[in-house]
Design a protein with these regions (language model features):
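Gram-negative bacterial Sec-dependent N-terminal signal peptides
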Residues: 1-30
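Subtilisin-like serine protease catalytic core
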Residues: 32-41, 50-51, 61-166, 180, ...
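Substrate-binding/access-modulating region of protease and related hydrolase catalytic domains
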Residues: 32-33, 69-71, 121, 133, ...
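Extracellular beta-solenoid/beta-roll
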Residues: 453, 466, 474-549, 554-563, ...
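Extracellular repeat-rich scaffold modules on cell surfaces
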Residues: 290, 297-300, 307, 312-313, ...
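Outer membrane beta-barrel translocator domains of Type V secretion systems
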Residues: 657-748
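Extracellular S/T/G-rich loop segment that most often corresponds to the catalytic His/Ser-adjacent loop
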Residues: 79, 101, 249-323, 327
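C-terminal subdomain of the subtilisin-like protease fold in secreted/lumenal serine endopeptidases
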Residues: 51-52, 59, 184-186, 259-262, ...
Length: 748
């Protein structure tokens, strides 16, 4: 609802009388050129930007400088239509949706989101604040590049939003927006019924009783929120201590929380003359709503005031957050918007207040991750995406809520006893009693299921960096990709299969499960663990090395090693050490793990492990050190013969520094080592002498055989004769069994 406005026409460069002559005499108006520069918030504070003081109050320039303008995000508006001919609401981005169906009385309807005779300027003004173009003329909206879909209430702003609006019509209108793919719907439409008051909780219960147990338009709005859409509702302009029933609906239907946003309003002096957040504080923020300049039918602009003007600031800000975090769902994006808001003095909100809820959106803070985790929060970053959250992340609001829920539960138990409702409502209960009972039971059940600690789950193959100092109390799970902690976490971290923990920060504890990897540092660095750590069988501790440094884990508690592997790689390399890299590091020692509480257990292996070179671990009481050099494989273990084994044993005694020993250590495989042993054994020399002596008889025996053939008369008469004999042979050195040398030979 709007409480006042002033109008001014859209400025034009040419008067109507001179339009044709001026067009002939002057060149065409140049296309708008954006002066805003990436990384420079001040460059975005153009004259157009300054026409809406709400942009500066929410620090929208910080989002624009980060490249965030709402592009690609679909948002909706439920209001009194809009003027599609306004230059700032172009058809390329503003699209009306059509609500079609049959009213409760059987009359058919088909109503477009474009203005009709039943409408007023309200919807056009609200729509401009949502997303009017940034084109150098007039003003621009918060999410000036978003796609805006508009449904029509088919009424004006005086339309009362009590229980009487036709539920069939609103179901069709809300569903048309949801079917268009909008992620949030702005609801600034209508006025408060005169027969209700939101000043007290009893008054709110009475107002909600008008809707309870019957089909009303509120069911239509709630229906699309249960499909995942965020409904944004203005809180109302009457100055009550609480937001209206419609903006406070999750109080009565707790399952809607997370998909509902109530919005109160401020003036330029931080005054709040409108309905405060009250019972809606956990899903309520407060945005600029006084003297807001925006679009008007006919191409002009005007100032209007009220929470109707505040709500689209919040919806536009939510669209920017949605663009900033494409991997978050709607509820998560809303949580970022809420938890990065600030109180009126600019301080971050620890817990929402009855007056302003979470406070004023701070789009500068909202660009740097959530400010709090309000339960389990899963960040599912796809492969190839890397993001950084630099905000300190707490869960302090949950402490306040836990105390309030406990007090409310105790009060509800007293109510059940005092009213005799412990076994349910009596027959003949009034409408108000049925309403109160349903509200109390729903809220008590929701509180029983609520989580009062924030927790983070890193999922997906992408990478997330936490660089703030975070104090949320629940666990941190790494279920996929990389979570790099460069700030600090009070939370303990559990690394599951497919996940990797990195960073050079500090965490509360560490558990690496089978398939999980811990890779301390970003490149080479140290990860601190304030408590205990444990590596389970099948886990991996991935250590990067340079000539002078390595990754390291330093724990204040105990280290329990139940197996797993230590893998070695050069700094900034994804691959395990090559043999030549191992050779380059031979003789170096690295501290890779320290635990003040002691070390229990052993890793299974160090990889890579080449034939005679690799890494070995030295376990001390409170430290594990890595030595690069000779591994545990004996030279003789790859020998094929006793002679080779004898040579290998002799070389082993030479030790480091001897060129023969050092050369053998560089053998790439067993065959290479065996050839070296054979050459060093000298076996070939006596075997060769015997072989040559034995082979000399073959020529002698062949000549003798021919002579015997002649004496036996086998040769022919006087004719010339030829004679030849082919010889073939093979031979090899004997196996040298029992230390003897020899050979085997055969002639064919």
């Amino acid at each position: 609802m709007t409480d006042d406005h002033s109008f001014r026409p859209r400025p034009t460069s040419l008067s109507a009388a001179l339009l044709l002559g001026a067009w002939i005499a002057q060149p065409a108006t140049a296309a708008y050129v954006e002066a805003g520069r990436p990384g420079d918030p001040a460059s975005w504070r153009s004259a157009e930007y300054q026409q809406d003081w709400g942009l500066e109050r929410m620090r929208a320039d910080q989002a624009y400088a980060a490249g965030i303008d709402g592009q690609g995000v679909k948002i909706g508006e439920m209001d009194s239509g809009f003027d599609p001919s306004h230059p700032d609401t172009p058809a390329s981005r503003y699209q009306p949706v059509t609500a079609s169906g049959t009213y409760v009385d059987g009359t058919p309807f088909s109503v477009s989101g474009a203005m009709n005779g039943n409408n007023d300027s309200h919807g056009t003004h609200v729509g401009g604040t949502l997303g009017a173009s940034r084109d150098g003329v007039g003003m621009h909206g918060v999410a000036y590049a978003a796609q805006v879909y508009v449904a029509n209430t088919n009424q004006n702003d005086s339309f009362l939003f009590g229980p009487t609006p036709d539920p069939n019509y609103f179901k069709a209108a809300y569903q048309a927006l949801a079917d268009a793919g909008v992620r949030a719907i702005n609801n600034s439409w209508g006025s408060q019924p005169k027969d209700v008051s939101y000043e007290t909780l009893d008054g709110l219960h009475a107002a909600y009783a008008q809707h309870y147990g019957r089909s009303t338009w509120l069911d239509a709005a709630a229906g699309v929120s249960r499909q995942g859409v965020i409904n944004v509702f203005s809180s109302g302009n009457s100055g009550y201590a609480n937001a209206s029933v419609r903006s406070a609906l999750p109080y009565f239907q707790p399952d809607l929380e997370g998909h509902w946003l109530a919005v109160s309003g401020l003036d330029q002096q931080n005054g709040q003359r409108y309905n405060r957040c009250g019972i809606a504080k956990y899903w309520c923020i407060t945005t600029p709503g006084r003297l807001i300049n925006s679009t008007m039918p006919g191409g002009g602009y005007a100032n209007k005031s009220g929470t109707s003007m505040a709500a689209p600031h919040a919806t536009g800000a939510l669209a920017l957050v949605m663009q900033r975090y494409p991997y978050l769902n709607n509820e998560q994006a809303l949580q970022v918007l809420l938890t990065t808001a600030t109180q009126l003095d600019g301080t971050p909100t620890g817990a929402p207040t009855d007056t302003v809820g979470w406070g004023v959106p701070d789009l500068g803070r909202a660009m740097h991750g959530p400010g709090q985790l309000l339960g389990r929060f899963e960040a599912n970053l796809p492969a190839g995406l890397r993001d950084e959250w630099s905000n300190p992340i707490s869960d302090s609001a949950l402490l306040q809520r836990q105390a309030e829920d406990a007090a409310e539960h105790a009060a509800w138990q007293r109510t059940l006893k005092d009213k005799g409702w412990e076994n349910g409502l009596p027959a003949g209960a009034s409408q108000q009693e049925r309403t109160d009972y349903a509200i109390g039971m729903a809220r008590d059940q929701a509180a029983a299921q609520r989580q009062y600690q924030g927790s983070l789950v890193k999922a997906g193959a992408g990478s997330l960096v936490l660089s703030g100092d975070s104090t949320y109390r629940g666990p941190t799970l790494v279920d996929g990709g990389l979570l790099s902690v460069d700030g600090s976490l009070l939370s303990a971290v559990e690394v599951n299969a497919g996940g990797t923990l990195g960073g050079s920060g500090r965490i509360g504890g560490l558990l690496a499960r089978s398939g999980g990897t811990v890779a301390a540092g970003n490149s080479i660095g140290t990860l601190e663990v304030a408590g205990d750590l444990r590596f389970e069988s099948g886990s991996t501790y991935a250590v990067e090395l340079s000539e002078s440094a390595s990754d390291r884990i330093v724990a204040s508690g105990k280290a329990s090693i139940a197996g797993g592997n230590v893998t070695l790689a050069m700094e900034n390399s994804p691959d395990l050490l090559s043999q030549s890299q191992v050779e380059s590091l031979v003789g170096r020692r690295y501290d890779i793990l320290d635990a003040a509480g002691g070390i229990d257990g052993r890793f299974d292996a160090v990889l890579p492990n080449y034939l005679f070179l690799g890494g070995t671990l030295d376990y001390a009481a409170n430290a594990i050190r890595l030595d690069i050099g000779r591994n545990g494989t004996a030279l003789a273990s790859v020998a094929q013969t006793p002679n080779q084994a004898a040579v290998a044993g002799a070389v082993e005694t030479l030790g480091a520094g001897n060129p023969v020993y050092e050369s053998l250590l560089l053998s790439e495989n067993a065959a290479t080592a065996q050839r070296a042993f054979q050459q060093l054994s000298g076996e070939i020399y006596p075997a060769l002498a015997g072989l040559l002596l034995n082979d000399s008889r073959y020529l002698r025996d062949s000549v003798g055989e021919r002579l015997r053939q002649t004496s036996d008369g086998e040769a022919g008469g006087e004719a010339p004769e030829g004679w030849f004999k082919a010889l073939g042979s093979w031979g090899k050195s004997a196996d040298g069994s029992h230390g003897s040398e020899g050979y085997r030979h055969s002639v064919l």
